[in-house]
Amino acid sequence: MIFQSFLLGNLVSLCMKIINSVVVVGLYYGFLTTFSIGPSYLFLLRALVMEEGTEKKVSATTGFITGQLMMFISIYYAPLHLALGRPHTITVLALPYLLFHFFWNNHKHFFDYGSTTRNSMRNLSIQCVFLNNLIFQLFNHFILPSSMLARLVNIYLFRCNNKILFVTSGFVGWLIGHILFMKWLGLVLVWIRQNHSIRSNKYIRSNKYLVLELRNSMARIFSILLFITCVYYLGRIPSPILTKKLKEASKTEERVESEEERDVEIETASEMKGTKQEQEGSTEEDPYPSPSLFSEEGWDPDKIDETEEIRVNGKDKIKDKFHSHLTETGYNNINTSNSPIYDYQDSYLNNNNTGNLENLKLQLLDKKNENQDLFWFQKPLVSLLFDYNRWNRPFRYIKNNRFEQAVRTEMSQYFFDTCKSDGKQRISFTYPPSLSTFWKMIKRKIPLLSLQKTLPNELDTQWVSTNKEKSNNLNKEFLNRLEILAKESLSMDILETRTRLCNDDTKKEYVPKMYDPLLNGPYRGTIKKGVSSSIINNTLLENWEKRVRLNRIHTIFLPNMDYQEFEQKAYTIDKKPLSTEIDEFLTLINELGNEPKSSLNLKGLSLFSDQEQRRVNSEKRTKFVKFVFNAIDPNETKSGKKSIGIKEISKKVPRWSHKLITELDQQMGEFQDRASIDHQLRSRKAKRVVIFTDNNATNDPEEEVALISYSQQSDFRRGIIKGSMRAQRRKTFISKLFQANVHSPLFVDRITPLRLFSFDISELIKPIFRNWTGKEGEFKILESREEQTKREEKKEKDKKEDNKRKEQARIAIEEAWDNIPFAQIIRGYMLITQSILRKYILLPSLIIAKNLGRMLFLQLPEWSEDLQEWNREMQIKCTYNGVQLSETEFPKDWLRDGIQIKILFPFCLKPWHISKLYPSRGELMKKQKQKDDFCFLTVWGMEAELPFGSPRKRPSFFEPIFKELEKKIGKLKKKYFLTLKIFKGKTKLFRRVSKETKKWFIKSIGFLKKIKKELSKVNPIVLFRFKEISESNETKKEKDYLISNQIINESFSQIESGNWPNSSLIETKMKDLTDRTSTIKNQIERITKDKKKVTPEIDINPNKTNNIKKLESPKKFFQILQRRNTRVIWKFHYFLKLFIQRLYIDLFLSIINIPRITTQLFLESTNKLIEKFISNNEINQEKITNKKKIHFIFISTIKKSLYNISKKNSHIFCDLSYLSQAYVFYKLSQTQVINLSKFRSVLQYNTTSCFLKTKIKDYFKTLGIFHSELKHKKLQSYRINQWKNWLRWHYQYDLSQIRWSRLMPKKWRTKVNQSCMAKNKNRNLNKWNSYEKDQLIHYKKENDSELYSLSNQKDNFKKCYRYGLLAYKSINYENKSDSFFSRLPFQVKKNLEISYNSNTSKHNFVDMPGNLHINNYLRKVNILDIERNLDRKYFDWKIIHFSLRQKGDIEAWVKIDTNSNPNTKIGINNYQIIDKIEKKGVFYLTTHQNPEKTQKNSKKVFFDWMGMNEKIFNRPILNLEFWFFPEFVLLYNVYKIKPWIIPSKFLLFNLNTNENVIQNKNQKQNFFLPSNKKIKNRSQETKEPPSQRERGSDIENKGNLSPVFSKHQTDLEKDYVESDTKKGQNKKQYKSNTEAELDLFLKRYLLFQLRWNDALNKRMLENIKVYCLLLRLINPTKITISSIQRREMSLDIMLIQANLPLTDLMKKGVLIIEPIRLSVKHNGQFIMYQTIGISLVHKSKHQTNQRYREQRYVDKKNFDEFILQPQTQRINTEKTHFDLLVPENILWSRRRRELRIRSFFNSLNWNVVDRNSVFCNETNVKNWSQFLGERKPLYKDKKKLIKFKFFLWPNYRLEDLACMNRYWFDTNNGSRFSILRIHMYPRLKIN
């Protein structure tokens, strides 16, 4: 068995090896390429089909195979690949050959005249067949294009080692495939010939010569196919001759530019020259080739080779220059005057005045331009046919006004090559292409062995070792610092200090940060100072040295140079003495630096010392000198004249050699210097519309005010350069005339949904359900506000869409007129013809006809009235865009640009004119409408509202006549029928009465007695009572159902609609309520009536005798039964309806009652719990006088929200983060025995974070907290993908102002946001409370339906406080150290009413939405001045006060001016009793104001403190649909904040009482001044704030149980008292709200912008149009008055004065002030805090936020006793906590970056799982505790925090990432951050 399995295993492995072998893969790819059919197959097929002899077949097959072999070889051999893949190859060779072949096949006899020999090889046709098959293999394939195959082959080629074997096997596979293919083809052809059924075909038999004709015309068929191929390729490849040549930028500009660039940096690329002359220019100027060959432009090798070719094909080739002088005799024969290198430079050498250089260059350029005209045909053929500098591809030209030419976009940013890094060969994708080319050239010239000798590995090893050593040193230093810190040493030397450059030691003045090189690196700028002669000499010397070396290198790389020969001649001098010779020679040059070069006498110079001269003979000396002079460029002398300094490092960007202008630029008259040049860019179709011309200077076109009107048509050619190809778009089509994007037909159904198949199921079901229940009326009534608004919105939407459709149609017509040639001329003439016809022929003839008709009907003619109206009609000529001119004046160039004719007061023929004595109201309205009436004339003489609009309906002439006739006929008919009716009725009645009355009277007397008897048996009272009761029950149920549903719908609609207009909010709501109540009443009445009809009742009426008859006579019983049956069948439908209705009501009532019962139980249990806790705590509290049952104010909301959940299927609550903590706590408090340890994490996080376990979820499900959908939604575990989770749960990148106060470790960070009430407020508070109490009690008497009364604000707050205390205690029941609630708020100690720390506490009752994004308006001002802002006022949740609506709906912020109720004062702790005024809203903003200052008529203005341009005062701003306890949600959805931070009062500080604002006004000027206090050695981290020390000492001195307050807080208290009690003597009194708002705005925002109102914009444009018309008129007064009457001109805009104050402009609504969205330049600290602050979300917010704050412990027995921690270790531990959460902060930034990069280079552990083990292994984390030096209770929280810190790169900064990104990945833009795969560096090992 073992042997068998062994064999089997071997077999499998052998098979796998065979399958994966190179040969098999090659064969596979070869077989695949068989199916790529190209044009060459046509020739092969033709040779096989045409039976032209075996020679042709053989030659075709041979050519076919040879061509494919060439293609395969080209895959491996790069030069061949380049040669075949070049665009010139196909352009120059293949296309002409194709055309020639086409001509050859069609004119065969032309070549057949002299062929007599029978030698097959000399026969031209056989060679042609071979060539055809060979050449057409190089063409692209038609079927199964081989691009995919080629890519696969390339990928495999890149992977496999044995490339030649792979290519060979690929070719063999291809060969086998093609042999099989050809054999199969042969067999098919033979079968066709031999098949009898094909030959005996009726059609073929009837056409005897069909096969012969087919065979004869086969050549023609193939030639047609080839011609199609030819056209296809012409379409793909740009024709070299037909494409448009672009005029290049002026040569002189380029020349100067390139000169400057060469001086800046030798290695940068000079401008790419497009044509030969430019190349000549560069070679003549430089004795070495232009460095653009080696430029870092990311070229592919094709482009480099092209430039080589162009350079090689030049007129004077550099190789010839050098080759002619480097002869075997050495340098003896050199003569500078004859040398082409110095042909224009010797005059410069022999000239003392170097200033003639520029003139000389210009002369040379002129000469060159002359030569260019003469010898244009000397251009090389390749660059003529294929100019790579031309825009052949459809590139967009990106215009850049700052530079001369556009940047080339197709240059790749990446270039792959191998390089050595860390001593290993690696592939780099940012390898400089110039270096790669350079290295290839070196390899070509120098033998590989000598290269390998010169490149030892010592350098690499040395580099690696030094890098390791440096990183180890850094690590050691870092660890040493950490260890010292761990020992709790307080010396400040631990932190690495940052050295600053100091100006003055005594004053300690530092250089500004910007210019400090120690902070910002060297300042890169030119140092403009006088240069000493020694510096000039040194730089000259350096430049000479450089140029010697440079030219020496360039001579190596000149084409076709015999390197060995050159080396022999050059190095005939001994190498050792040569170095000394060079040294001495250079010192000599240095001495002679200042002398003119012409005075150098080369023959008489003694270059060397005497000793050296003995060794070196004279021949060697002269040889050396001439070699040096040949290498040195004498041109270098000019460097002495240039300013010496640090040049700015810049990379040369590849640019096009053309500067192009658009059609629009040409039209607008820009680029006047190039006015003669035609535009090269296709721009969007546009028209220049002149709206105003200055009459004084009509000739000057610049005085015209013009607009550009763009065409609406989709133009995909826009921005494409003329002559360039169009993009080859596949699978796209343009179906409409105007289409924004091109779409693939594949997605047509996505773009326009098919009407047949699109339907909404819910919409279909609704009517069925309604019919089934039979409650259509109720459905209509109960249709919520939401649905009503939806319907209205749909109507509006349809209307808008209709208008949009009309507008599109109008634009389409306009575009059509624009596009058709000569259309405007035709249209113009047609319009003028129509206007003349209308005015002088059509209308007068109509007037005549009408009046003649009137005369015929004996009516008075109305000549005067009609003629008056006809005269009133004005036909004004307008420009194409509708700007009015006058009746006689035609617009400029109207035949070309177009014309419109506007008809003012268009004439309308009326059958009669109404008497002017008594006009009706309707006629008056019509007249008013006609005043504004105007229209535009269409081409067909119709009237349109807008130019090119659809013709409008004119009032019919005959319609009023017919109406009048109808009225008269109707009146006559009425009269006639009335008389007839009366006459008939009277006669009938008289006859009938006489007969009937007699009979009926006699019978009725007999039955009266019987009825009496029957009634005495039955008790009628019982029957009636029973009926009444059942009916009343029914109606009650109905009412209940209706009202309950009504409430729900109403609340939803009111909450959800967030954009009601500000002004009429209250009125609309009132109106809605009244409407709704009335409709409900009507509906109930109607339902009761319907029921009466529906239920069949026995009518027991003693007056009627029918029933008695029926009961008495047994004969008629059967008939009665029959009738009853039919009636039952007839009314069964109604019975069914009634039954369903009952069922429906009962179900709904039961559902509605469930939440009521549950909430009652719910609240009772919580009351018991809370009272139990409170009773324990009452010992240390003050005696609370007003003991009552706690009524929570959110009961009504619970009802509603619970019902909403049941109604909405709770799909919203699948995300755990939507559950408010208050709700969770309530649910938990209901359960009797509960294990709270499981839920501590849940209850403490603001979002139920990724740490939530599944068992907790299951437990919650059993408790009924979560719903069943959550069961399947497993949250990702924390370890799977930390990065994703981290981002998912910490997405709040915008820092709010309050988070600033939390994060920045400054003085104000330690302040506790505490609301300190002033002493004098106690009295006012009591007064106000009593007043409110009276009001509430009074109101409660009036309306008993109010659920709960808020009798006392103080008591309510106490309740909420107890609730919060209980919540916190139960959550932190294990961890007593975490408790922060010290005692009840209203214990009077030092008159401070609230003493808990609102900044450190986590309020369960302030639960903000976690998913709202804010626009962050952070400014430098706020950051600098935040300390002062915090000193002003604090705003916590107690400012927002509660009030209950009757139905408990939360609705809006309601603005109440104080003049609405003179008794309602606005004070600190006063909630407005809004219910009395109107039953709206729960939360009301109150403002701080002195009671003395509150006057009866004063108005309060709430300022929108976030700076958002939203008017929030009179409309609802939050959708509370998701919240269970909305009373505890801050009603501000824009300002997002963490739940444990309370917004402070400075956000809503009062305008009138804030003295700080006014006092600080003068100080704000100093915001941007640098502070004078400088510290010489500044620590990287901020030092311990002074406030902390003060507070620490303060605590130590006190030592009692009083709450901890810093000195700042006591100051704050004073500030409160002062600001509130002072009279308003220093306060600025504002005249109006606008002024106050403006003033505050200017204080808040130093920078702002003024924005026009949008509505004003439109009115402005209308005004401008009218002004344009008025300017042209001679007597404009009449038109002015009429235009004002028609409201075409707005006088309020005309009255805007230049010197109007800003407040007036704001009042008028002309200007809107809004803050500028500044991109504030933040320093590194800000970015660090923004990045790191996100990860600081932690369980113990208390500790995270207040690291410097004293921890407090709470005794187990008594929660409210406050015990202080011993003070010994406090300062040290807390300081280290902050620094060591980010241990790297010890080092300063540059060293930190170095540490990271070095650690990165040496990191060996790349495995992701291992790297993340940091987060899972607790022992690793625990190692850090020795650095933290903290107490044990803190440790458990810090551990997780450290985990967070090491979760990312520790304290990584954004700028570091950006730097590393650029450094490693060569990305120069931020969009490629996705490339980043940053590896966290390995953990530091602690010994």
Curated annotation (Swiss-Prot):
InterPro entries: TIC214. Residues 256-268 have a biased composition (Acidic residues). GO terms for cellular component: chloroplast inner membrane. Involved in protein precursor import into chloroplasts. May be part of an intermediate translocation complex acting as a protein-conducting channel at the inner envelope. It is a multi-pass membrane protein. Residues 248-300, 785-805, 1569-1603 are annotated as: Disordered. Part of the Tic complex. Belongs to the TIC214 family. Keywords: Chloroplast, Membrane, Plastid, Plastid inner membrane, Protein transport, Transmembrane, Transmembrane helix, Transport. It comes from the Eukaryota. The gene is TIC214. Residues 1578-1597 have a biased composition (Basic and acidic residues). GO terms for biological process: protein transport. The chain crosses the membrane at residues 18-38, 64-84, 87-107, 124-144, 172-192, 221-241. The keyword Chloroplast applies. It comes from Solanum tuberosum (Potato). This is Protein TIC 214. It is found in: Plastid, Chloroplast inner membrane.
